[in-house]
Amino acid sequence: TSGFLYRKVAERLPRDRVRVIMPTTVGLGFSSKIPASDHTLNNHIGWINTVLKELELNEVIYAGQDWGGPIGMGALSLSPEMLKGAVLMNTVFNAPKEKADLTTMHARVKTPILGELLVELLFNPFEQLARVQGDPSSWSDDVIRLYGKPVLESGNSKAILSMMRMVPDGPDPVSYTH
């Protein structure tokens, strides 16, 4: 959901040969916050596609992780002439054939009121990043604070809740539009 996760990889890329663009999902970074109801897969795909077209990119080698998989590849499917290659990690493109939750926390946040209590009052998802994203020793307290700063300081935890609720949990997830 944030290019910040790949900051160390980006630092090592040869800037004389590649242009690195690391967008953060709309509403989650330092961008303007949007209503929770606007966090839909189609909206995010459209917003990223608009950015890609505005930048007039070609020969894009896209790297996407988590929601960056369906959002980025969905955006590029609207402008396939841009895409040269892709590196995709820890992501999904199709809804599961059977009902299943990704994690216990994903199952709990789908419950109205309980989800709001967990994500907005009791549980800071950013504090768990070191445990679930890569090498735990690479996440200092300062990095964890910086990663969560745009959402936590704005009071926009509904964005995190919306994105967690969008995770496909069966053949007809709410995040997919037919």
Predicted regions and their residues:
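Conserved catalytic-core motifs of eukaryotic protein kinase domains, centered on the activation segment
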Residues: Y6-R7, S31-S37, E98-K99
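Conserved hydrolase catalytic core segment
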Residues: E59-K97
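Helix-loop "lid/cap" segments that line or gate small-molecule binding pockets
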Residues: N124-S138, L146-L152, M163-D169
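Conserved HGGG/HGGXW glycine-rich cap/lid loop of the alpha/beta-hydrolase fold
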Residues: T1-F30
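Conserved small/polar residues in nucleotide/adenosyl-binding loops
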Residues: T177-H178
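Active-site loop/oxyanion-hole signature of alpha/beta-hydrolase fold enzymes
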Residues: M22-G64
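Flexible "cap/lid" loop of the alpha/beta hydrolase fold
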Residues: G85-E116
